[in-house]
């Protein structure tokens, strides 16, 4: 099984067509091609294409879902991303610490989904509960929010 089929990037209720395009570009850089969108807001495909650069071939491969459960049906490992601590004390792992585990699971042909939440508020607690792993990406404490298309998963 190829890396592009094993790893699924899931964006929930995306509001920016530019973020979809930029995410496709980052995915292609990392060898991923499986993007799933759950209830995206109105999509401007010209903007998606413009920001995807040389990853425009992935636009036709985007899968659309009405629910997270539907998108996760074939997932064996679900990684939820978050930039903030929650009132519910979920154990978190940094991307650096988690990478060897994910690479090991990929070598075992496991299907992995990586969840990214809404641009304005991230993932809900219910969505986080559907994950096996809660991942944080270390940033400057003064401004801990990353644009999802700037995250390099490797």
Question: Where are the model-predicted features located?
Answer:
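Short, acidic/small-residue loops that bind anionic groups at enzyme active sites
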Residues: 118, 126, 133-149
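Short, glycine-rich nucleotide/cofactor-binding loops
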Residues: 8-20
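Short beta->alpha connector loops at strand-helix junctions that form conserved
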Residues: 12-13, 38, 82, 135-142
């Amino acid at each position: 099984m190829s890396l592009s089929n094993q790893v699924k990037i899931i964006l929930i209720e995306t509001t920016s067509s530019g973020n979809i395009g930029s995410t496709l570009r980052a995915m292609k850089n990392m060898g991923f091609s499986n993007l799933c969108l759950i209830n995206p807001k109105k999509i401007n495909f010209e903007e998606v294409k413009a920001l995807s650069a040389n990853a425009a071939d992935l636009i036709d491969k985007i899968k659309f879902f009405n629910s997270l459960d539907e998108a996760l049906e074939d997932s064996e490992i679900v990684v939820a991303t978050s930039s903030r601590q929650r009132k519910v004390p979920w154990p978190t792992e940094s991307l650096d610490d988690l990478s060897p585990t994910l690479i090991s699971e990929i070598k075992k042909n496991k299907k992995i989904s990586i969840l990214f939440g809404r641009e304005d508020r991230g993932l809900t607690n219910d969505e986080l509960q559907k994950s096996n792993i809660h991942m944080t990406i270390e940033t400057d404490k003064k401004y801990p929010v990353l644009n999802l298309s700037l995250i390099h998963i490797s």
